[in-house]
Amino acid sequence: MESKEILMLIDNISPHAKEYVEKAFENNQVDIIYSVSTVENMGVFIAVDNKDCCIFYAYFLNGNNIEQILDIIKNKTKEYILKFDSKEICFNVYGNNLKIINEVRKLGFKVDVEGYHLEFIGKELPNLNCCNLIDKGFKSDMLKEFINLFDSSYYQLYKDNGWRVNTNAINEEQFYKKLIDLDKHSQVRSFWINNELVGAYIFCQNYITDIVVKPTVQNKGYGSYILAHCIRNMSMNESIRNIRLRVAKSNTGAKKLYERNGFIEIAYFSEHTYE
């Protein structure tokens, strides 16, 4: 299978994975362990090996009747684990390949994150319906409010996934520097009711990295308004196309919100690290 075809398949795991593998091809760091392109199935199992880590990627369009593929994955992965006992080893799988995901976890890989990449495909920009939110950027005297907003908005999601909570309060100085830099490039907007911060968004390049709404004011339409504001800002003021975002698999409410507002799923990933 040619590298171009492989990259098209890896893109279904995530666009970032595709970019990483593309660079690895340029540096001759890709081991094409198995590939198939038939009427019954299309897929690939590769390893990208560099000085820092080894990352496996597996994508198969048809996840049924793949016992032979599972054996190849099991045996080859074991070989690499023995070979690189001191190197970090990761395994990124297409989210619909449940049999492969189960096999990977049997081999000792622990899930880091599972989720989707979505892309805005609306033919027209969303309207900004009348709302009582006041739009601002970020200033240094807003730091405490931003910390409380982001940590409270992500608390339940992070807790449910076993991730560290209250990370912005813990890394206050780092978060502050990040916000100052984002504001300098007009990549962060905050939304207020009177003097209360109730929501915000952050974007980087063509990705919306954060959409947060204060838990006590959720389900009032603020999320849709802030999302629409972000899309319009990125498109009209920054001339950004292919607006995308990443959402955790467990965050079903957010995924539904995005899909109601013109986003479609373009990739589905399940990322693991060997322990």
Regions found by a protein language model. Name each.
Residues N64-L133, G137, H272:
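Acyl-donor-binding surface of acyltransferase catalytic domains
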Residues I89-V93, I208, I243-V247:
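Conserved hydrophobic beta-strand within the GNAT/NAT acetyltransferase core sheet
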Residues E22-T77, L197-T209, P215:
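Conserved donor-binding loop and adjoining core beta-sheet/short helix segment
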Residues A47-D52, W163-I211:
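A conserved beta-strand-loop-helix scaffold within acyl/acetyltransferase catalytic domains
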Residues M1-K23, N129-T167:
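Short amphipathic alpha-helix that is part of the acyltransferase structural core
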Residues D11-T38, W163-V188:
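Active-site rim helix/loop that mediates acceptor-substrate recognition in acyltransferases
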Residues N65-K76, F191, V217, G221-C230:
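Conserved acetyl-CoA pyrophosphate-binding loop and the N-cap/start of the following alpha-helix
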Residues G95-V113, S224, K249-A267:
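Conserved active-site alpha-helix within GNAT-family acetyltransferase domains
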